[in-house]
Amino acid sequence: MQASNWMTPRERVRAYFRAGRPVHLPVDPTGPGPGEAFPFALLPGDPERVERIAAHLENPRIIGRNREFTVAVGTYRGCGVTVCSTGIGGPSTEIAVLELAALGVHTLIRTGGTGALDARIPPGSLIINHAMMRDSGPVDAYAPPTYPAAAHPEVVAALTAAAEELGFAYTCGIGATTASYYQGQGRAILPGGDEHLARFRHLGIINLEMEAATLLALASLLGLRAGVVLGVHINRALDRWDDAYEATQDKVIRVALEAVRRLGRGGAAASKTAGGTSRRV
Protein backbone atom coordinates (compact mmCIF):
# COMPACT_ATOMS: atom_id res chain seq x y z
CA MET A 1 0.00 0.00 0.00
CA GLN A 2 1.28 3.45 -0.91
CA ALA A 3 0.59 6.68 0.95
CA SER A 4 -1.93 9.06 -0.65
CA ASN A 5 -2.26 12.82 -0.44
CA TRP A 6 -5.60 12.62 1.40
CA MET A 7 -4.08 10.68 4.30
CA THR A 8 -2.94 12.24 7.56
CA PRO A 9 0.80 11.92 8.33
CA ARG A 10 0.07 9.10 10.80
CA GLU A 11 -2.00 7.27 8.20
CA ARG A 12 0.80 7.68 5.68
CA VAL A 13 3.25 5.99 8.03
CA ARG A 14 0.80 3.14 8.58
CA ALA A 15 0.52 2.74 4.81
CA TYR A 16 4.12 1.54 4.83
CA PHE A 17 3.57 -1.06 7.55
CA ARG A 18 3.96 -4.69 6.49
CA ALA A 19 0.85 -6.81 7.08
CA GLY A 20 -0.25 -4.23 9.64
CA ARG A 21 3.06 -4.32 11.52
CA PRO A 22 5.62 -1.51 11.81
CA VAL A 23 8.63 -1.98 9.58
CA HIS A 24 11.11 -1.61 12.45
CA LEU A 25 9.48 -1.55 15.90
CA PRO A 26 8.87 -5.06 17.29
CA VAL A 27 5.16 -4.49 17.86
CA ASP A 28 2.06 -6.48 16.90
CA PRO A 29 -0.71 -3.86 16.50
CA THR A 30 -3.38 -6.52 17.07
CA GLY A 31 -2.21 -7.12 20.64
CA PRO A 32 -1.62 -4.92 23.70
CA GLY A 33 1.09 -2.42 22.89
CA PRO A 34 1.84 1.21 22.03
CA GLY A 35 -1.30 3.10 21.13
CA GLU A 36 -4.59 3.90 22.79
CA ALA A 37 -3.90 1.72 25.83
CA PHE A 38 -0.32 2.98 26.29
CA PRO A 39 -0.29 6.47 24.71
CA PHE A 40 2.58 8.01 26.72
CA ALA A 41 6.05 7.06 25.48
CA LEU A 42 9.42 7.36 27.21
CA LEU A 43 12.31 7.24 24.76
CA PRO A 44 15.73 6.27 26.15
CA GLY A 45 18.56 5.81 23.69
CA ASP A 46 20.02 2.67 25.27
CA PRO A 47 17.99 -0.55 24.76
CA GLU A 48 19.21 -1.81 28.15
CA ARG A 49 17.61 1.24 29.77
CA VAL A 50 14.15 0.00 28.78
CA GLU A 51 14.05 -2.71 31.45
CA ARG A 52 15.26 -0.24 34.08
CA ILE A 53 12.39 2.11 33.25
CA ALA A 54 9.93 -0.77 33.05
CA ALA A 55 10.85 -1.74 36.62
CA HIS A 56 9.10 1.46 37.75
CA LEU A 57 5.86 0.44 36.03
CA GLU A 58 2.95 -1.70 37.15
CA ASN A 59 2.48 -4.92 35.16
CA PRO A 60 5.45 -4.25 32.88
CA ARG A 61 5.88 -6.36 29.80
CA ILE A 62 8.64 -6.46 27.17
CA ILE A 63 6.88 -6.47 23.80
CA GLY A 64 9.91 -7.25 21.67
CA ARG A 65 13.43 -6.45 20.52
CA ASN A 66 14.69 -5.60 17.05
CA ARG A 67 18.06 -3.99 16.35
CA GLU A 68 18.31 -0.84 18.49
CA PHE A 69 14.61 -0.94 19.34
CA THR A 70 13.42 -2.58 22.56
CA VAL A 71 9.78 -1.92 23.43
CA ALA A 72 7.97 -2.40 26.74
CA VAL A 73 4.57 -1.37 28.08
CA GLY A 74 3.06 -0.97 31.54
CA THR A 75 1.12 1.50 33.64
CA TYR A 76 2.21 4.25 36.01
CA ARG A 77 -0.42 5.50 38.45
CA GLY A 78 -3.19 4.77 36.00
CA CYS A 79 -1.41 6.02 32.88
CA GLY A 80 -0.54 3.61 30.08
CA VAL A 81 3.18 3.95 29.30
CA THR A 82 5.23 2.70 26.35
CA VAL A 83 9.02 2.56 26.69
CA CYS A 84 10.92 2.42 23.40
CA SER A 85 14.67 2.74 22.91
CA THR A 86 15.80 4.81 19.94
CA GLY A 87 19.47 3.93 19.64
CA ILE A 88 21.96 6.71 18.98
CA GLY A 89 21.24 9.61 16.67
CA GLY A 90 18.54 11.14 14.54
CA PRO A 91 17.77 8.48 11.88
CA SER A 92 16.74 5.76 14.33
CA THR A 93 14.89 8.34 16.44
CA GLU A 94 12.92 9.36 13.34
CA ILE A 95 11.85 5.74 12.86
CA ALA A 96 10.77 5.32 16.48
CA VAL A 97 8.79 8.58 16.59
CA LEU A 98 6.96 8.00 13.31
CA GLU A 99 6.07 4.38 13.98
CA LEU A 100 4.93 5.12 17.55
CA ALA A 101 2.82 8.00 16.25
CA ALA A 102 1.23 5.72 13.67
CA LEU A 103 0.37 3.26 16.45
CA GLY A 104 -1.47 5.97 18.41
CA VAL A 105 1.08 7.35 20.89
CA HIS A 106 0.35 11.05 21.53
CA THR A 107 2.96 12.18 24.09
CA LEU A 108 6.69 11.39 23.94
CA ILE A 109 9.46 12.23 26.41
CA ARG A 110 13.13 11.68 25.62
CA THR A 111 15.02 10.35 28.63
CA GLY A 112 18.79 10.03 28.54
CA GLY A 113 22.12 11.68 29.16
CA THR A 114 23.83 14.84 27.99
CA GLY A 115 26.96 16.94 28.29
CA ALA A 116 26.59 20.44 29.73
CA LEU A 117 28.48 23.39 28.27
CA ASP A 118 27.65 25.91 31.01
CA ALA A 119 30.09 25.78 33.93
CA ARG A 120 27.22 26.51 36.34
CA ILE A 121 25.44 23.22 35.58
CA PRO A 122 26.77 20.45 37.86
CA PRO A 123 27.17 16.81 36.82
CA GLY A 124 24.40 14.72 38.33
CA SER A 125 21.78 17.44 37.87
CA LEU A 126 19.05 17.44 35.22
CA ILE A 127 18.43 19.49 32.10
CA ILE A 128 14.92 20.09 30.78
CA ASN A 129 15.30 21.55 27.29
CA HIS A 130 12.45 23.74 26.11
CA ALA A 131 13.99 23.89 22.64
CA MET A 132 16.88 22.47 20.65
CA MET A 133 19.11 23.89 17.95
CA ARG A 134 18.94 21.66 14.88
CA ASP A 135 22.51 21.06 13.73
CA SER A 136 21.61 18.93 10.67
CA GLY A 137 19.74 15.63 10.77
CA PRO A 138 16.70 13.79 9.37
CA VAL A 139 14.28 16.65 10.05
CA ASP A 140 15.91 18.43 7.10
CA ALA A 141 13.96 16.01 4.87
CA TYR A 142 10.66 17.24 6.36
CA ALA A 143 11.08 20.94 7.03
CA PRO A 144 13.38 23.88 6.23
CA PRO A 145 16.31 24.69 8.55
CA THR A 146 14.30 27.58 9.99
CA TYR A 147 11.63 25.20 11.38
CA PRO A 148 11.99 25.10 15.19
CA ALA A 149 12.53 22.09 17.41
CA ALA A 150 10.53 23.18 20.45
CA ALA A 151 9.13 21.12 23.31
CA HIS A 152 5.40 21.26 23.95
CA PRO A 153 4.72 23.77 26.76
CA GLU A 154 2.47 21.33 28.63
CA VAL A 155 5.25 18.74 28.71
CA VAL A 156 7.84 21.30 29.82
CA ALA A 157 5.50 22.44 32.61
CA ALA A 158 4.90 18.86 33.73
CA LEU A 159 8.61 18.00 33.73
CA THR A 160 9.63 21.09 35.69
CA ALA A 161 6.81 20.57 38.19
CA ALA A 162 7.89 16.96 38.67
CA ALA A 163 11.51 17.95 39.25
CA GLU A 164 10.40 20.57 41.78
CA GLU A 165 8.17 18.10 43.59
CA LEU A 166 10.92 15.47 43.76
CA GLY A 167 13.54 17.98 44.90
CA PHE A 168 15.94 17.45 41.99
CA ALA A 169 18.20 20.26 40.76
CA TYR A 170 17.52 21.09 37.12
CA THR A 171 18.27 23.71 34.49
CA CYS A 172 15.97 24.86 31.69
CA GLY A 173 17.43 26.19 28.48
CA ILE A 174 18.20 25.60 24.81
CA GLY A 175 20.39 22.67 23.82
CA ALA A 176 21.78 21.48 20.50
CA THR A 177 21.31 18.17 18.75
CA THR A 178 24.29 17.16 16.63
CA ALA A 179 24.66 14.52 13.94
CA SER A 180 28.26 13.87 15.04
CA TYR A 181 29.49 12.79 18.49
CA TYR A 182 33.19 13.51 18.02
CA GLN A 183 33.98 16.31 15.56
CA GLY A 184 30.48 17.81 15.67
CA GLN A 185 30.55 18.19 19.46
CA GLY A 186 34.02 19.71 19.57
CA ARG A 187 36.00 16.51 20.23
CA ALA A 188 38.40 17.51 17.50
CA ILE A 189 39.65 14.69 15.26
CA LEU A 190 40.45 16.87 12.26
CA PRO A 191 41.34 20.58 12.17
CA GLY A 192 38.39 22.84 12.91
CA GLY A 193 36.66 20.62 15.43
CA ASP A 194 37.18 23.08 18.26
CA GLU A 195 35.21 25.69 16.34
CA HIS A 196 31.98 23.74 16.80
CA LEU A 197 32.13 24.00 20.59
CA ALA A 198 32.99 27.70 20.47
CA ARG A 199 30.01 28.34 18.19
CA PHE A 200 27.59 26.57 20.52
CA ARG A 201 28.84 28.51 23.53
CA HIS A 202 28.60 31.80 21.64
CA LEU A 203 24.94 31.01 20.92
CA GLY A 204 24.15 30.28 24.57
CA ILE A 205 23.63 26.55 24.03
CA ILE A 206 23.67 24.83 27.44
CA ASN A 207 24.07 21.18 26.41
CA LEU A 208 24.73 18.79 23.54
CA GLU A 209 23.11 15.47 22.63
CA MET A 210 22.05 13.60 19.47
CA GLU A 211 18.31 12.84 19.42
CA ALA A 212 16.08 15.53 20.95
CA ALA A 213 15.71 17.91 18.00
CA THR A 214 14.50 15.07 15.80
CA LEU A 215 11.87 14.13 18.39
CA LEU A 216 10.68 17.68 19.05
CA ALA A 217 10.46 18.83 15.44
CA LEU A 218 8.73 15.67 14.21
CA ALA A 219 6.29 15.78 17.13
CA SER A 220 5.32 19.34 16.21
CA LEU A 221 4.88 18.39 12.55
CA LEU A 222 2.68 15.44 13.54
CA GLY A 223 0.62 17.34 16.12
CA LEU A 224 2.01 15.40 19.10
CA ARG A 225 3.29 16.54 22.50
CA ALA A 226 6.97 15.99 23.26
CA GLY A 227 9.58 16.98 25.80
CA VAL A 228 13.09 16.24 27.00
CA VAL A 229 14.64 15.47 30.39
CA LEU A 230 18.31 14.53 30.52
CA GLY A 231 20.88 13.67 33.15
CA VAL A 232 24.12 15.66 33.06
CA HIS A 233 26.92 13.10 32.90
CA ILE A 234 29.74 15.51 32.09
CA ASN A 235 30.33 19.23 32.30
CA ARG A 236 32.43 20.02 29.25
CA ALA A 237 33.44 23.44 30.53
CA LEU A 238 34.96 21.92 33.69
CA ASP A 239 35.87 18.49 32.26
CA ARG A 240 34.08 17.03 35.26
CA TRP A 241 32.25 13.70 35.02
CA ASP A 242 29.20 12.43 36.89
CA ASP A 243 30.32 9.94 39.56
CA ALA A 244 26.81 8.54 40.05
CA TYR A 245 25.62 7.68 36.54
CA GLU A 246 22.89 5.22 37.51
CA ALA A 247 21.53 7.42 40.30
CA THR A 248 21.30 10.32 37.85
CA GLN A 249 19.44 8.18 35.34
CA ASP A 250 17.02 7.11 38.06
CA LYS A 251 16.25 10.79 38.67
CA VAL A 252 15.57 11.22 34.96
CA ILE A 253 13.18 8.26 34.98
CA ARG A 254 11.31 9.44 38.06
CA VAL A 255 10.85 12.95 36.69
CA ALA A 256 9.62 11.64 33.34
CA LEU A 257 7.12 9.27 34.94
CA GLU A 258 5.81 11.89 37.34
CA ALA A 259 5.40 14.22 34.37
CA VAL A 260 3.35 11.51 32.65
CA ARG A 261 1.14 11.28 35.73
CA ARG A 262 0.54 15.03 35.66
CA LEU A 263 -0.18 15.04 31.94
CA GLY A 264 -2.45 12.04 32.31
CA ARG A 265 -4.63 13.77 34.86
CA GLY A 266 -4.62 17.02 32.88
CA GLY A 267 -2.70 18.92 35.54
CA ALA A 268 0.46 19.93 33.75
CA ALA A 269 0.80 23.33 35.38
CA ALA A 270 3.94 23.63 37.43
CA SER A 271 3.34 23.70 41.16
CA LYS A 272 5.61 25.68 43.42
CA THR A 273 7.25 23.56 46.08
CA ALA A 274 10.29 23.94 48.24
CA GLY A 275 12.06 20.98 46.65
CA GLY A 276 13.92 21.43 43.38
CA THR A 277 16.48 24.04 42.44
CA SER A 278 15.92 25.56 39.00
CA ARG A 279 17.88 27.88 36.78
CA ARG A 280 17.05 29.33 33.36
CA VAL A 281 20.09 30.17 31.29
Specify the residue positions occupied by each region the protein language model found.
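Short acidic/polar active-site loop segments enriched in Thr and Asp
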Residues: 106-107, 206, 225
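Active-site rim beta-loop-alpha module in soluble metabolic enzymes
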Residues: 149-204
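Flexible, glycine/charged-enriched surface loops at secondary-structure junctions
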Residues: 59-65, 167-174, 265-281
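Generic non-transmembrane alpha-helical segments
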Residues: 158-166, 218, 255-263
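Metabolite-binding pocket within alpha/beta catalytic cores that recognizes anionic/polar moieties
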Residues: 2-158
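His/Asp/Glu-rich mid-to-C-terminal helical/loop segments that flank catalytic regions of hydrolases
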Residues: 236-281
